[in-house]
């Protein structure tokens, strides 16, 4: 298998075969993200993708999961995606699911029948970076979508039978917009009612616009305790979920939590209250945090 540049995947895809079908991110303007700063977006030639699948077939027999990289593989047209999915199922008879990152524009750009076709071909989960439910925060970070568009895109995918894992980012509004960010994020996720919700904590990446804003004083990073308080506020505003698997086990977070909402909401809030009462001693040390 051949890879170009930095390749990332969600923690839940740790055991998946990672197949690059695009390079970089077609948007690549989010001010906090440094993943693809050195990798201009381009579509990988289809013949190369199919060759990689043939190579993987020889060494990854028994593969059950595949993740399509890079930043938003669903930018590809439906015909090309179905050809890739067909080739994967031919190469890996035991394949159970294929996953990919997707943004609102990608999902809304495909019809219901197109998404249903992709689901039938094996695309069973997409990972969507909501980041924030606040339109002001989304505008400042140059996300390229409004909260309403993000909500619509997740509902659109789920209506086609594709599971969605939503990702939001603690601290993204700084102290100024912390309350708005937390409350609006909780409301947006509630409106989405996704199968999975993961919260990460902002870590500034050198070379990104947000890092430069922090250096020049125009953006302020939340203190760890304030990050935790923001997390609690998001959980408080999560209402009407129907079996959402909730995780804060990413290495960027100060406190790892896991549960299913709404069943475990009271337990999660109690754990957060305990951590807030204990202060720094309850938090993951900075040296242990990472992206």
Question: What do these predicted ranges mean?
Answer:
Residues 25, 33, 49, 68, ...:
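Conserved, mostly hydrophobic/aromatic
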Residues 49, 81, 111, 150, ...:
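Aromatic/hydrophobic pocket-lining residues that form the small-molecule binding cavity
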Residues 5-48:
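Canonical Radical SAM [4Fe-4S] cluster-binding loop centered on the CxxxCxxC motif
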Residues 17-19, 64-66, 96-102, 126-128, ...:
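Hydrophobic faces of well-ordered beta-strands that scaffold small-molecule active sites
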Residues 57-159:
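Conserved SAM/AdoMet-binding glycine-rich loop
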